[in-house]
Amino acid sequence: MKFLYMLFAAIPALAVNITTFTVIGCGGTTHIFPCDGLCHASSNMRAFKVDAGAEHCVTVYSGNACQSGTLQFPTPNSEGECEPIEASQATLSFLCSVDNTCAT
């Protein structure tokens, strides 16, 4: 039993990532970030994809440091698919939660 516990403890949890794009159709410059519930800077983010098979919620902000003007994208709207951001303002930061709970 002790061996099985050590074996499962050694298997890392699968990391879920978000890929951001500078073009609405998921083109242009890309950056990859972890879906870790932390605020990430991403100037000119116009679309994103989150790894398939993972619950999440992406909250996009028009201000720096995840402040002001939010758009929310919960699962399953964008699971593994290109999600365009139709925003009138530039998107400067975002938060990708580790589950489907959106930031407020």
PLM features per residue range, with description:
Residues 3-104:
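Compact beta-sheet-dominated domain cores in extracellular/mature segments
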